[in-house]
């Protein structure tokens, strides 16, 4: 990630979305210069880089970097969090340590997003929380997306998707649902 930060700074890209990613191949606790066990580890690397400190702890010759960034949040709880209280605790840490905004994992039920934002505000999280809206465009996403992203699909939406005979029909239903989410 250090080389990516150098390149982004050189290119004038200063606003980042920091995501750990879904790497499942490394053992828990294993850390490399291209992978962090937690997004907060990546956050610390960017914060250090902004102060002119390299990943090995040494100072580097270039000027301090001006990166600002957002981080992920999960209206339906991160799959690795034992409960929502724990998830909110770490979310507060992300904001306390410099996250300028948050972007949610995709969701299909706006009520869950609204409840999540209300909970965040009650816990003192005041940065913008940008909703992650994604249309379903393939029939198989009805079963695949909930398994991969732990996002519930509301029954009225699932019922309409089950009626679809083709991916084109599923896409039309998915895009319409997404439009209605955005309008709401």
Annotated model-derived regions:
Residues 1-9, 85-90, 115-121, 138-144:
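Catalytic cores of alpha/beta
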Residues 1-5, 82-93, 174-183:
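Short, acidic/polar
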Residues 20-23, 74, 107, 134-135:
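Short, ordered loop/turn segments at secondary-structure junctions
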Residues 95-102, 124-125, 184:
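Short, surface-exposed connector motifs at secondary-structure boundaries
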Residues 8, 94, 98, 131:
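Conserved, mostly hydrophobic/aromatic
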Residues 2-44:
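Flexible, glycine-rich active-site loops centered on histidine and acidic residues
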Residues 33-66, 70-80, 87, 122-177:
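Active-site pocket-lining/capping segments in soluble small-molecule metabolic enzymes
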Residues 17-19, 100-109, 174:
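Catalytic beta/alpha-barrel core
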């Amino acid at each position: 990630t250090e080389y990516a930060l150098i390149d982004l700074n050189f290119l004038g890209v200063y606003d980042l979305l920091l995501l750990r990613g879904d790497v499942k191949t490394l053992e828990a606790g294993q850390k490399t210069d291209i992978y962090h066990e937690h997004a907060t580890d990546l956050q610390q690397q960017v914060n250090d880089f902004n102060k002119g400190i390299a990943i090995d702890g040494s100072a580097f010759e270039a000027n301090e970097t001006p990166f600002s960034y957002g981080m992920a949040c999960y209206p339906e709880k991160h799959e690795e969090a034992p409960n929502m209280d724990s998830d909110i605790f770490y979310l507060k840490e992300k904001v306390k340590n410099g996250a300028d905004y948050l972007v949610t994992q995709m969701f299909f039920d706006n009520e869950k997003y609204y409840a999540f934002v209300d909970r965040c505000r009650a816990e003192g999280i005041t940065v913008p929380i940008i909703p992650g809206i994604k249309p379903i465009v393939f029939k198989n996403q009805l079963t695949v997306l909930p398994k991969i992203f732990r996002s519930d699909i509301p029954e009225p939406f699932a019922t309409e998707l089950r009626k679809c005979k083709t991916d084109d029909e599923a896409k039309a239903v998915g895009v319409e649902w997404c439009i209605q989410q955005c309008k709401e």
